[in-house]
Structures are given as C-alpha cells and as structure tokens.
From Swiss-Prot:
HAMAP family: RecX (MF_01114). The keyword Cytoplasm applies. The lineage of its organism: Bacteria, Pseudomonadati, Pseudomonadota, Gammaproteobacteria, Pasteurellales. Gene3D superfamilies: Winged helix-like DNA-binding domain superfamily/Winged helix DNA-binding domain (1.10.10.10). This is Regulatory protein RecX. Modulates RecA activity. Belongs to the RecX family. GO terms for cellular component: cytoplasm. It comes from the Bacteria. Its main location: cytoplasm. Pfam families: RecX_HTH1, RecX_HTH2, RecX_HTH3. It is found in: Cytoplasm.
C-alpha cells in the first residue's frame, strides 16, 4: 500500500470529517490509483477514522442548526456527499430533531411580522422559502394559518 495515499487521507481527516465519496474524489484529483485509494480508505475505516454514518450525523446537525429541513439535507447528503440512502435514512430516523419546531422557529425568524391576513403573494413567498429550505408542506402549512398572537 502506498503510504503517501494513506498519509494524504489522514491529513485530510485531521482537519474535518469527510464522506468516502469526497475522499475518493480528492484522491482521484491527486492521481492516486483506485487500488491505492481503496487500500487507504479501508485502513482508515478499519480504524474508524472515516465513517459515512458519523459524517452524516455531523452534517445533519450542522445543516439543521442553519435552518435546513429534512428534504434539503437528504438531497445534499445523497447528491453532493455521496452517502448511501440507507445510512441517510438511519441517521434521520435516529435524529431527535423536532422538525416542526424548527420550521416554526425559522418562519418566525425570517418573517417576524407575518399574520394570517397577509396577501396571497406573501403566503406564496413564505411557502417557497420553506420548501427551498427542505421543509415538507405538512411541517409548515398550518403555521401559515396561525395568527400573530401565537407567534409572540
């Protein structure tokens, strides 16, 4: 095994967590062979220095703190980070995040003056904002109908 490949991965992992997909891409950019990549990754995973599950848990918590919902986080993990759907599903099921409460807090923060007499245009703007942040309509639709006194 190439100690250069192994040392490269260890150096990357010493700074932050990476998904296996991200590490593979970085190593391919440095022109390591597939064999070197596989061996170095296997060694790091055997030592539990790299784990897609742990990466996903950390990523979920980080993105949730920034106000993103399940849909957006799931999409990013799958498409951008290359994490398997099985791992994503497990991590989301074990998460103790209250997505409804998060949607409510995000709505209050972004639209503090909202009340149910708002124009349809404003309701559409809120709807689009929440969907773009990865919340399902059932997580925020009834919040749009709440009156201002419930937000205070």
């Amino acid at each position: 095994m190439s100690s250069l490949a192994f040392n490269y991965i260890v150096n990357l992992l010493s700074h932050r967590e990476y998904s296996e997909f991200e590490l593979r891409n970085k190593m391919q950019e440095k022109n390591f062979s597939e064999e070197e990549i596989d061996e170095a990754l296997s060694r790091c995973q055997a030592k539990n220095w790299q784990s897609d599950r742990r990466f996903s848990e950390n990523y979920l918590n980080s993105r949730a703190q920034k106000g993103y919902g399940v849909g957006r986080i799931r999409q990013e993990l799958r498409q951008l980070k290359g994490v398997s759907s099985d791992i994503i599903d497990e991590v989301l099921m074990e998460s103790e995040i209250d997505w409804y409460e998060m949607a409510e807090n995000l709505l209050r923060k972004k639209f503090p003056n909202y009340n149910e007499q708002q124009t349809p245009k404003m309701k559409q703007k809120i709807w689009q904002y929440m969907l773009s942040h990865g919340f399902r309509s059932d997580e925020f639709a009834d919040l749009i109908g709440q009156n201002q006194s419930e937000w205070d």
